[in-house]
C-alpha cells in the first residue's frame, strides 16, 4: 500500500487472514495507561482499518464537514458509517464522528455563492457621513428592512443603522443598536416615535451579520432577526397607524428633521451593505431567501443600489467587498463515544469520520492494483507529469486540485481514452470514475470557485470523459465492478451535480446552455418492469413506441437486473429543476408492473450494490392494482390547496400527511353528504325552500369531494386532469352559491321577516347553478393554457385562474359572515327578552349563560351550511398549522351537515317515523292482522304502537336543525 495510509495501515498486511478473505492481521498491542482513570485502550490511529459486524471501517485522520466527509468516502468507493460503531472500535474512538444516512447520496451540500457588492464605510463617527435615498417613500402599513452590517465594537454609544423621517414625524422609523464590549450588539426598532427595548441581536465579534426588522400596522406586531434567526418580537409598537408617506430614507444617521439634523452621537461606526426595503412583512422563509442572496421581489421598494443614493463625499469612493451568501445551519447526525449516544452537530463543522465497506467489495478493492488496465493509468500520469489517476482506489487524496489543472487533466484523459483501442480495464475504470468524482467535488469546496471557476469548460470535459467510459464496449467492465461502484448511474449522478454550478455562467443574454459529447446511439430500447402513463418520455426517443416487458423466471430476472445496470430505458436519463434557492421538486406519477411469482422460483429482490435500485426519497405508493402499483412523488391536491393563493413548498412527510388526512376526511364527508342527500329523497321530507336548498347543497358538495378524491389518479392523464379540475371548479362554486342562497334565505326569514313571497326558486336555481357555469366558462376562455396547475389537478396559483374560485368564495364567506353576525345579534336580543318575561329578576349567572347559549347555538347550527369552515383555507400559505386546520374543518363539514340536518332534524325523523309506520302497517296487513282481521286473530290495535318508534314530544325551535 502507499505511504499515505499512515502507520496505522501497515499492520493491515500482517500474517493473519480472516475467513472472509480480508487481511486484518494482528491489531496493535493496546497501550495500557495505569493512571488514576484505570486501564485505557489506545485510540484508533489515522488510516487504521477495523473489522465491524457489517464489514470493515477505515478511520480517516482528517476532520471534514459532513458533506466533505461523505464525498471523501465516496471517492474511495465507501460510505460514512451508517450505524454507531460497535465492539472494540467504539471503545477506541475519542471524539464524536459523523454518521451517514442510507439516503445520503441523495443529499447535496448547500451551494454557497459569493458575490461582490459595494459597501458604505463609516470608519469614524461624524455628522457629515450619510447616504440618502433620492425618491421619497410611500405610506407603509407594513415593512421589512434587511442589511448586512459589520459593527465597530469599539464604539459603545447607540447609533442608527437607518432612519426614515416623514414631513410631520422625524422619528417615523429607525433601527438603532449599540455594542456591549466583549458581549453582544443590542438593537431596537423605533416606529412613530415609540421605542422598543434594546435586545440582543448578534455577537460583537467584528464580523458581517445579516440583520432584519419587520413591522405591521395591525396590532403593532414587530420582530427582529439576525443571521436567519428570530431574536425578539412583540406587539403594540405603533399600532393602528402607518408610517406616513413622503418619508426620507437615510442610511447610517439619525434624522432630527426631514432629511437632515444629523449628529455625531448617533452616527454609525462600521460598514453597511446590501440594504433592502419591502412594503410588507416577510415570513421567516422569505427572510431566509433574502439572507441567501435571493431577496423576494414582491413588495420590494428598494433593492441595494448605491447609484440610487445620494452619498456624502466623505463616504466616497465606495469600497467593493466579496460576501459569501450564507447557507442553512443544517445539523447532521453524529455518534459520541463518551456517553455512547447518537447526536447531531452543524453539518459545516469539521469532525472525524469513518469510511465503511462491505467485506467482499473491500477485499476486491485491496486487489485493484493487480487488475488489468494499469497501463492506461501509467500513460495518463506520465503525460501529465503528475498523479492524475490513483492506482490504489483506497488511498486518500493529498493536495488540492485547481480548476485549471482539472481542465488540463480532463483534456489529457479524453485524448488517451479516445486513442485506446482495447476495452477499458477494471483498474483504469475505477481510477477514471474516482477522478471524475474529484473534479465534480470542486464545487462543494471553496465558495470563491463558484464565480471564478471555468465550470462550462470543466463540464464539457467531464461529459466527454464520462461518455467514453459509458461506451458499449465497456459494459463487461461495468458488470465486473457492479458490487464495487454500484453501476453506471453512480457516475451519472456525479455528472449531474455539475448542472447547478453552471448557473453562475448563465445570464439574461445567455439563458440556455447545452453541453454534449455525441449521441449515445440508442435504438430498439426495451423498458423493463415499467410502462409510461404519459407519452412525454417516448417523444424523446426517435424510434418505435416502448413495449413494456417483464421477466418470466428468477433466472431471467437476474439477467434483466444485470441488463438494467448497463442499459438505459430513455434518452433522458435524469432531469432536475433549480431556482436561486436550490432544487425544486417536480411532481411525477409512474406505474410499476407486477411480476408473476412462481412457487418454484421465488423472486429475489435486486441488490442496490448491483445497480438498478430505486430512489424513494419523497415518494410513496399511491394505489395498488391487481397487476401494477402506482407511485407518486412530492405533490398532490388536498383541501389545503383549494383556497391556497400562493405556491407553498412543503416537505415530503408533510405533503404525505396532508394528502392522507385530506383523503380520509374527504371520504368521511362524502359518505355523510351522500347519506344526507338520500335521506332527503327517500324519507319524503315535506317540500320547502330550505329543503330544496339543502338538497342542492349536499348534492353539489358531495359530487365535488368525489372528484377531489379521484384527482390523484387523474394527474397521470392531461385530459383527465383538466376535466377533473373543471368539474371540481364548477361543483365547488355551485356548493358555495347554494351556501349564499342559504344565507339570503336566512336573512329574509330571520332578519327582514318579510311577509311578502320571496324571489322564488327559479332565481335561487339561477344563482346556484347558472352563475358557476358563467364563471367557469369565462375562466376557460381567458386562460385556456394556464388553467390547470403544474403538479396537481387544480387551478393554477401562478396565474389569475385561482382567483376565479377564491374571488367568489371570499364574496360568499364575507356575505354569510355578516348575515350570521346579524342573526346572532337578533337571537341574543330575543333570548334576553324571553328571560326577562320568564323571570323579572334573573340572577347574573343565569343571564350570562342564557346569552352565551343564544350566541353559540345559531353559530353551531348554521356554521356548516354557510361555509364558514373554509375561512382557514385562505391562510394556508402563512403556516403549516393553517393547512392542517383547513383540512380538518373542511373534512368534517359533510359529517356535521349529516348530524345537524339529518340525524338530529325533527322533520327528517318524523318522515322516517311515518315511513316506519307505513311499512309496519303493510307487514301487518300482509299477515292478515289489520282492521277486522285483527279481531279474528286476537291482535288488538294497541299492539301496533309497540312496532313503531316514539313520537317526538318537544316543540320545534326555528333555529334547531332546520331541514
UniProtKB/Swiss-Prot annotation:
Its main location: membrane. Residues 489-649 form the GAIN-B domain. Residues 599-649 are annotated as: GPS. Residues 1-662, 713-720, 784-800, 879-880 are extracellular. Residues 684-691, 742-762, 822-857, 902-963 are cytoplasmic. PANTHER family: ADHESION G-PROTEIN COUPLED RECEPTOR, ADHESION G-PROTEIN COUPLED RECEPTOR D2. This is Adhesion G protein-coupled receptor D2. It comes from Homo sapiens.
